[in-house]
Amino acid sequence: MLGLNHTSMSEFILVGFSAFPHLQLMLFLLFLLMYLFTLLGNLLIMATVWSERSLHTPMYLFLCVLSVSEILYTVAIIPRMLADLLSTQRSIAFLACASQMFFSFSFGFTHSFLLTVMGYDRYVAICHPLRYNVLMSPRGCACLVGCSWAGGSVMGMVVTSAIFQLTFCGSHEIQHFLCHVPPLLKLACGNNVPAVALGVGLVCIMALLGCFLLILLSYAFIVADILKIPSAEGRNKAFSTCASHLIVVIVHYGFASVIYLKPKGPHSQEGDTLMATTYAVLTPFLSPIIFSLRNKELKVAMKRTFLSTLYSSGT
């Protein structure tokens, strides 16, 4: 898959949370509970959309696919992090490190692309309702979903290939809980490291900023159309279909901007690790909560699905 350059070292050591030895057991239990809740919440959303025929619409199809991407993203990161919290042996093979970076970036960017697609879906539903069935046909939805996954895979491949073509020398300790770009760049040596760092940074920022601007543009048109609705009840009903998606977008990009766009200055590695953990663990944890609480139709359907599952298991 990659022309990996590992002439200087064959494995890395994930330092992770070694600076917090007294907190590792507590962090393990906390992250394990959040991880299990993330999996169960997203699986419940998927089961509900699958079982309720009234939810077989593009909006809930995209939500279901978003849940898949969140499950895969957390699976790519959190199990390894949990294992390291209980272990003193935190080495990770070169190929395993590259694989973790590829999958985490692929599913992370797929998540961003799907949020953009969901924004477009809401724009079409509110601003062009008469053309909705044409623009959001099954074939069109499949194309949007396929492009999101393909785009995420391409981004993961581009970033991983660029980083692991570098030569790594000196220390093999990654000052992070996963194989991430900034700490790996600190271990790389060679004249091309600054160019690779700049290129990878620009590609990631342009992709994420492009998604964010498209979402903003969609909501600019949505708000403009909602304000034209004469009744307050109509405006509230129209906006309620967008509220959960908008909150998830704010949480997703809010945490990402705090972590990746914070000004460079004197700050501890421990602080960076905790902030990155917030993004990797807390964001997927909050997403199913927001969608299930803010979407009345989904909330009612989830209760019905959950109760029917309990009843069938009880009998």
From Swiss-Prot:
Cellular compartments per GO CC: plasma membrane
This protein's UniProt keywords: Cell membrane, Disulfide bond, G-protein coupled receptor, Glycoprotein, Membrane, Olfaction, Receptor, Sensory transduction, Transducer, Transmembrane, Transmembrane helix
CDD domains found in the cross-reference section: 7tmA_OR10A-like
TM spans (from-to): 26-46, 55-75, 100-120, 140-160, 198-218, 239-259, 273-293
Disulfide bonds: 97-189
InterPro entries, sorted: GPCR_Rhodpsn, GPCR_Rhodpsn_7TM, Olfact_rcpt
Subcellular location: Cell membrane
Glycosylation sites: 5
Coiled-coil ranges from the UniProt annotation: none
One GO biological process term: detection of chemical stimulus involved in sensory perception of smell
Protein origin, superkingdom: Eukaryota
Keyword Ion transport: no
Residue spans, topological domain Cytoplasmic: 47-54, 121-139, 219-238, 294-315
Any one GO molecular-function label of the UniProt entry: G protein-coupled receptor activity
Cited PANTHER family: OLFACTORY RECEPTOR (PTHR26453)
Family: Belongs to the G-protein coupled receptor 1 family.
Name of the protein: Olfactory receptor 10H2
Source organism of this protein record: Homo sapiens
